[in-house]
Amino acid sequence: MDLNTLLETTVVGLGYELVDVEMSPRGRTIRVFIDAPAKETGIDVEDCAKVSNQLTRVFEVENFDFDRLEISSPGLDRVVKKAADFERFSGQEIQIKVRIPQGGRRNFQGELLGLKDGKVGLRLAKDDVELEFTNIEKARLVPRFD
């Protein structure tokens, strides 16, 4: 079983959402970002400890070698990767970087309008744009401090 499948199965099985995974260049440090959409208060230390303990056991059983495992909440500027996330966070401010420039630009920031027919809608200061979902390299929410 590959690492992403192993992580997804374990994290979802514990009742959390797997947001993102980062690995150090040599694969010795694994950073796992989790969320609990049903929980109003977000991820806390107990959630991270629960996932960490379970993943440590799973890695031992699966004979997956690592030096350090870090579990964290996705933070206010969370990564937006999955198609469902582009719907879930509709109406929020987002930064998007595309692989292939569109209209001479690779970086966009505006209000997320959602995902429809494989295109992510974005309201910019002057107009609305549609970006191909498959062309998105990175997307992050922009935190609001009201």
UniProtKB/Swiss-Prot annotation:
The UniProt entry's sequence similarity note says: Belongs to the RimP family.
Which named protein is this?
A: Ribosome maturation factor RimP
List the Gene3D superfamilies: Ribosome maturation factor RimP, C-terminal domain, RimP-like superfamily, N-terminal
> Which function does this protein serve?
Required for maturation of 30S ribosomal subunits.
Which Gene Ontology terms of cellular component type are present?
cytosol
Which locations, inside or outside the cell, does it occupy? Answer: Cytoplasm
Alphabetized, the UniProt keywords read: Cytoplasm, Ribosome biogenesis
Q: Give the HAMAP family listed for this entry.
A: RimP
GO biological processes: ribosomal small subunit assembly; translation
Report which residue ranges the record marks as coiled coil.
none
